[in-house]
Amino acid sequence: MVLTIRAILWVTLITIISLEFIIGILGNVFIALVNIIDWVKRGKISAVDKTYMALAISRTAFLLSLITGFLVSLLDPALLGMRTMVRLLTISWMVTNHFSVWFATCLSIFYFLKIANFSNSIFLVLKWEAKKVVSVTLVVSVIILIMNIIVINKFTDRLQVNTLQNCSTSNTLKDYGLFLFISTGFTLTPFAVSLTMFLLLIFSLWRHLKNMCHSATGSRDVSTVAHIKGLQTVVTFLLLYTAFVMSLLSESLNINIQHTNLLSHFLRSIGVAFPTGHSCVLILGNSKLRQASLSVILWLRYKYKHIENWGP
């Protein structure tokens, strides 16, 4: 009976993870295609749309790297003992995750600089040079990426030494847990940046509402609505990102447990929810993407009815 319940839970988690992968890939490919088509039609593209497109592409690559690692661990776990395979999987995961997180952070910076209202001269300069601010942010992220790659190389070398010396599986898993813990540490930097943008947006909204109370203006003006929409997008990103970081930390702390157990699959399902859920939020929160998604849904409904009419 216990075995049956365990099997049902295992299949349920695998199904959830599979659906998350499918929805995540379709959602991010959709975001990228909409922006590419719009770019081709107009002959130009805004910096924000470029960030959306880059984020969607990096998220798609990240999900594909997760699928690859998941299939390798499921179908042939022995490959994880090979230095080349470990290096390939870890670096591909780390690079795609790095850019997907940093591009999302750049979106938070764009929202903050576009929506927030401060009279500070430094803020006004940053607001005017928003593109340069994002460019500098990406350059800094590349420096952090290089540092992360150095750590990854040391990790794979150590793992190879353990394999050659026939070290126990627990030692290998401890090294992998250390890798996850360190990688999580590197992802905390963009999280701190996004959290700062969120807090500054709240402060900007509070000041704006305070000024409106003094001037006896209505509470739902354009600036207030923009603040609220920006906060909704950023806070959703932070919540999903927090769940993602916690899943990585939990997996690194529970790494001595067999990696195919229910807890591991549950943590992976939480991790995959980050790139999947955030892409859905971006589609719903962006007017162009939302309109394009409605057009696709209407087209699919029309095709479905057309097929039904031709049926027997």
UniProtKB/Swiss-Prot annotation:
Residues 28-61, 114-132, 207-229, 286-312 are cytoplasmic. Belongs to the G-protein coupled receptor T2R family. It comes from Mus musculus (Mouse). Gustducin-coupled receptor implicated in the perception of bitter compounds in the oral cavity and the gastrointestinal tract. Signals through PLCB2 and the calcium-regulated cation channel TRPM5. Gene3D superfamilies: Rhodopsin 7-helix transmembrane proteins. The gene is Tas2r103. It is a multi-pass membrane protein. The chain crosses the membrane at residues 7-27, 62-82, 93-113, 133-153, 186-206, 230-250, 265-285. This is Taste receptor type 2 member 103. One of its GO terms (molecular function) is bitter taste receptor activity. PANTHER family: TASTE RECEPTOR TYPE 2, TASTE RECEPTOR TYPE 2 MEMBER 103. It is found in: Membrane. Several bitter taste receptors are expressed in a single taste receptor cell. Expressed in subsets of taste receptor cells of the tongue and palate epithelium and exclusively in gustducin-positive cells. Expressed in 15% taste bud cells in circumvallate and foliate papillae but only in 2% in fungiform papillae.
